[in-house]
Amino acid sequence: MRFDSNGYSADYVSAFEYSTNGLPIILAARDGALSEALDEHIERVLAEHNSDKVNIACHSLGTAVCGHYLNDQQRAAKVNAYVALDGAGGTGPDTTCPGEEGWRAPCLGIFVDPERTIGPNNVHLPDETHVQAATSAASFAAQFEFFTGEEPTTTDIVVEEGEVAISGRAVYFPANEGANGSTLRVWEIDSDTGERLANEPLDSFAIDATGEWGPVDLVTGAHYEFELQRPGRATHHFYRQPFLRASELVRFNTSAAGSEIETNTNSGPEHAALVISRDLEWYVDNGEQTDILEISTVSPLQGDQPAFNLITPEMGNGNIGIHVHDDVATPRETTGALLAYFHAQIFQTGADVFMPGDPDPDGYISIVSSPRGDTERKQQLNVPNWASSEHRISLTFNDFVQD
């Protein structure tokens, strides 16, 4: 959206998505197994825009995927410029852009570690983190200038007033395969309680193997629920902060039937289960910049639960997804103890929090984030207290605070 805010049409931005469902698949991606699929994606983009070359930005494992792609002369010839975001690179003065001599696309490395480089052009963001280095305003500014030769006019996301078109995919995580056979319904909600404002959804989309849904016209600044109905399974409810601009790249990650995510989530008719995510690592032990993430529940039937800050040093600073539910060991009690399975997953952790719930919600759950400990610029989402026996809840906070 920052590119679009600076006149770089959103139609020119596309995502190449692939599976990371298990170590063998990850290792295959690292070793070049996706070069043909990436080439097909690039060919589609070139044909769509009647162009000869693309710019590509690749993050983390994606830098290995793109590095293998660029090692082929014919494929490298389709790339105008390449940005490597905190992934493959080296140390010292002799690192080079991927590819063969005479066929290398110009490259830019953006790294957290000030010792890492890739070729002659590098930007170091030592005060940022691995995921943040792909999404931050500073990273965007470096990418934009490298691709266009000009500094961006703004690093803010410029708000579009009124209705904007929103679309994307509903996919099984981490396979990135479409949630085939499900239905996505879109509701406008009360920002104070998460309650739906109408008896019928604004729109509804049948999800096929592509996972694609939309577009739907939504009002910037308004709050919405995206309800993914999964036949024979718990309904998955997605909530996020209000949209600021049109987007074709909204993703809803759900779990496949019988997945380890599903089997390790303790569910029941009297408590809620949710996942909180943000494309910025949660700082759990970083002095005054430690994040605060408080959860409270209003439940007339079961009793209110006071605000509890689930951020603890034991979580570690490298996570972007936090699973939250009442654990088996201490039912109806909030201890904040780590949920062992989720804490063992890369970029994820989990905490024991009792949030009273009901299949027919009797109240709501408030989740309040103070990014980097800044209590003057809080972010808040309020959602119905759906019981986990029949429902799952996912919340996405912005990785930025913008006045």
Predicted features by range, described:
Residues 132-144:
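Post-His helix in hydrolase/transferase enzymes
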Residues 144, 148-164:
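Beta-strand-rich domain onsets/edges
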Residues 77-133:
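The feature captures the conserved acid-bearing segment of alpha/beta-hydrolase catalytic domains
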Residues 164-172:
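Beta-strand-rich structural segments
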Residues 107, 120, 166, 182-184:
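A broad, low-specificity signal marking well-ordered, structured residues that form hydrophobic/aromatic
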